[in-house]
């Protein structure tokens, strides 16, 4: 979460009159994040999150994202619930931006998750996949292989400025993926961005999932692979087998992976690492410092890609 657009108190108070959230008592911007402007609201009826959607989120996608959050919440997934205005709408306009109020979730994101936390994430991810299976709306993954290629075409000529030899490495990865990317595996709604800053905990118990603005339809096992990348590597880029084993066991306790999904996990993990490396690389090379987008060093995902290239079996991730 972050703040890129300021909101005047009077303007916010008038906006809130359209919602059943009581009177504004106080509000403050939330500094963390990369995509939208977020504020914590305290009102006479409780606490809420206000999100203003910046340019990277397409307004046409908002009904999918918000509808999914409502669907999952109604299915028992602990995630924010959009607040409906008095006129029945969910999406409003504030400070010239599409704006939504969502319920507040208790908990904190973790900087140093343990294996116990990873097991909780695995269970929650599987529960999300099952709960989303009958969601009636669909959204293609804009950051699947075709989307990766567009990013790579824009960044390739300068890739070796970041890491010597990177262009040749990624070219070889693309050749492999475009021939051998897994097809026909179980698929449906995935979160696609379940990083530690998008998961809240109260102690060792997971209390909520947030930030569904990359959610889409894709392979369930690809979502698992993304979580392996996000949760199971240490600061020195080493893979923590104990965390990997815990995350995968947690997932399989709710939704067992098929044999085909297990066999595909090394390639899916490498592809997921490439996807996040590419978005970071593109921003690193094309976004000016001080702009609306928070730039992240692509190096850690280059290291993950190299790790996954050497993996021969999902058992090396801790899969029983």
Curated annotation (Swiss-Prot):
Enzyme Commission code: 2.7.1.39
Pathway in which the depicted protein is active: Amino-acid biosynthesis; L-threonine biosynthesis; L-threonine from L-aspartate: step 4/5
Keywords: Amino-acid biosynthesis, ATP-binding, Kinase, Nucleotide-binding, Threonine biosynthesis, Transferase
Pfam families cross-referenced by the UniProt entry: APH (PF01636)
A GO term, aspect molecular function: ATP binding
SUPFAM superfamilies tied to this protein: Protein kinase-like (PK-like) (SSF56112)
A GO biological-process term: threonine biosynthetic process
UniProt similarity note: Belongs to the pseudomonas-type ThrB family.
Protein name as annotated: Homoserine kinase
Source organism: Mesorhizobium japonicum (strain LMG 29417 / CECT 9101 / MAFF 303099) (Mesorhizobium loti (strain MAFF 303099))
Recorded name of the encoding gene: thrB
């Amino acid at each position: 979460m972050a703040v890129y657009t300021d909101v005047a108190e009077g303007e916010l108070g008038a906006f809130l009159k359209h919602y059943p959230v009581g009177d504004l008592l106080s509000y403050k911007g939330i500094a963390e994040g990369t995509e939208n402007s977020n504020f914590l609201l305290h009102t006479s009826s409780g606490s809420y999150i206000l999100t203003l959607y910046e340019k990277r989120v397409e307004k046409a996608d908002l009904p999918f994202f918000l509808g999914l959050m409502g669907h999952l919440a109604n299915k028992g997934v602990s995630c924010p619930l959009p607040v409906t205005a008095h006129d029945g709408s969910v999406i409003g306009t504030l400070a010239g931006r599409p704006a939504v109020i969502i319920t507040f979730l208790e908990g904190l994101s973790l900087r140093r998750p343990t294996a116990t936390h990873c097991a909780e994430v695995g269970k929650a991810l599987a529960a999300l996949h099952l709960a989303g299976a009958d969601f009636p709306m669909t959204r293609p993954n804009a950051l699947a292989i075709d989307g990766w290629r567009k990013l790579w075409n824009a960044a390739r000529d300068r890739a070796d400025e970041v890491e010597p030899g990177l262009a040749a490495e990624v070219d070889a990865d693309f050749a492999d993926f475009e021939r051998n990317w897994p097809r026909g595996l179980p698929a449906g709604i995935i979160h696609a961005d379940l990083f530690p800053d998008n998961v809240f905990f109260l102690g060792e118990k997971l209390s909520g999932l947030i930030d569904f603005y990359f959610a889409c339809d894709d392979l369930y096992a690809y979502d698992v692979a993304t979580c392996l990348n996000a949760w199971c590597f240490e600061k020195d880029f080493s893979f923590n087998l104990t965390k990997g084993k815990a995350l995968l066991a947690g997932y399989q306790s709710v939704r067992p992976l098929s044999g085909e999904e297990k066999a595909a996990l090394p390639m899916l993990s490498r592809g997921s690492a490439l996807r996040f490396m590419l978005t970071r690389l593109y921003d690193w090379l094309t976004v000016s410092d001080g702009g609306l987008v928070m730039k992240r060093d692509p190096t850690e995902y280059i290291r993950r890609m190299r790790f996954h290239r050497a993996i021969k079996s999902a058992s090396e991730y801790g899969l029983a």
